[in-house]
């Protein structure tokens, strides 16, 4: 009977500690794991089609015409 009471009190104490720390740390995680769609978008090369402007930040699918600064 005493052992059962000790186990119940220990479980309640651990549960309370987890709930308290979960409330305190909400939104403060520094190094969050990237979601799979974020990882995929970072790995996907996006290119601009024909006639779109190109430059340092925009990559063309084929080539960039430096005179017109458009994709060819």
Curated annotation (Swiss-Prot):
A GO CC term assigned to this protein in UniProt: extracellular region
Q: Which domain of life is it from?
A: Eukaryota
Where does the protein principally reside? Answer: secreted
Q: Please give the positions of the paired cysteines in each disulfide bond.
A: 47-61, 54-64, 60-71
Q: Does the keyword Magnesium apply?
A: no
Task: Report keywords, A-Z.
Answer: Disulfide bond, Knottin, Secreted, Signal, Toxin
Keyword set includes Transit peptide: no
Picking any one GO molecular function of the record gives: ion channel inhibitor activity
Q: Per the database entry, which stretches of residues form a coiled coil?
A: none
Give the residue range of the signal peptide: 1-22
Expression across tissues is: Expressed by the venom duct.
Q: Which residues form the propeptide?
A: 23-46
Location(s) in or outside the cell: Secreted
The record's comment about this protein's domains reads: The presence of a 'disulfide through disulfide knot' structurally defines this protein as a knottin.
Indicate the family of this protein.
Belongs to the conotoxin O1 superfamily.
Q: What is this protein called?
A: Conotoxin 3
Please name the source species: Conus striatus
């Amino acid at each position: 009977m005493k052992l059962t009471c000790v186990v119940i009190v220990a479980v309640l104490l651990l549960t309370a500690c987890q709930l308290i720390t979960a409330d305190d740390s909400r939104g403060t995680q520094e190094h969050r794991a990237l979601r799979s769609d974020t990882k995929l978008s970072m790995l996907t090369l996006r290119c601009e089609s024909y006639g779109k402007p190109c430059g340092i930040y925009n990559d063309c699918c084929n080539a960039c015409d430096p005179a017109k600064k458009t994709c060819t």
